C-alpha cells in the first residue's frame, strides 16, 4: 500500500504503531503473548514493525519519507513502557526512519484523551518522553496530544524539544486553526 500511496502522489507515509492497533499489539508484552520469534523480548516484539518498515522502505526507496506514530507508553499494567518505546525508536532511527510521532495510550487506557496535564504540570501529554528520546536519537520528533495554546506549541519547538506539533482534535473543531496561529491570533 505504501507503493500505491507514492504512485498516487502523496509526499510520505506513516506507520500507525500506537493506540492498541495491530503494530502496537505486537509491541506490547501485555497483548503479545507469543512464545516464538515474534514475542517475548522487546527485540522479538519489535520484529513486526521493523519488518514492516524495511518492506516499506524497499518499496518506496530512500528518498520517500516514512514515519511512525508510536506510543511513548500504553499506560497499561504490564504493557508497553517508555523503555520499550526508546528501544523501538532507537532501532528505527538506526535504520533510517524519517520521523517519529509520539503519542500514547490505547482505547483501553486513552492517555491521548485524558487530563495528563494536571499530573505533569505541562500542557502536552508526552513532552517528557520527547525530551528523553531527543537525547538519544537524531530524528525529527512530533508530539501529538494535549497542546492547547500556541504559546506552548512555540515553546516546545523553539526549545528544540520537538520539530513539529501534531494536532488532531483541535483541527477537527477549527479546521482553520493553523492559519489562525500563523497569523498571530491567540489560541
What are these regions (language model features)?
Residues 1-187:
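Flavin-dependent oxidoreductase catalytic cores
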Amino acid at each position: 500500500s505504501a507503493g500505491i500511496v507514492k504512485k498516487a502522489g502523496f509526499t510520505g507515509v506513516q506507520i500507525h504503531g500506537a493506540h492498541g492497533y495491530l503494530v502496537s499489539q505486537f509491541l506490547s508484552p501485555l497483548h503479545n503473548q507469543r512464545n516464538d520469534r515474534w514475542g517475548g523480548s522487546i527485540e522479538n516484539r519489535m520484529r513486526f514493525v521493523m519488518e514492516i518498515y524495511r518492506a516499506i522502505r524497499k518499496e518506496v526507496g530512500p528518498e520517500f519519507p516514512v514515519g511512525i506514530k508510536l506510543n511513548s507508553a500504553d499506560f497499561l499494567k504490564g504493557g508497553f513502557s517508555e523503555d520499550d518505546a526508546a528501544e523501538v525508536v532507537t532501532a528505527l532511527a538506526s535504520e533510517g526512519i524519517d520521523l517519529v510521532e509520539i503519542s500514547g495510550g490505547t482505547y483501553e487506557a486513552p492517555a491521548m484523551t485524558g487530563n495528563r496535564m494536571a499530573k505533569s504540570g505541562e500542557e502536552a501529554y508526552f513532552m517528557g518522553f520527547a525530551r528523553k528520546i531527543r537525547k538519544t536519537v537524531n530524528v525529527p520528533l512530533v508530539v501529538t496530544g494535549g497542546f492547547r495554546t500556541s504559546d506552548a506549541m512555540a515553546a516546545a519547538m523553539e526549545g528544540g524539544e520537538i520539530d513539529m506539533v501534531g494536532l488532531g482534535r483541535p483541527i477537527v473543531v477549527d479546521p482553520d486553526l493553523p492559519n489562525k496561529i500563523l497569523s498571530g491570533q491567540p489560541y
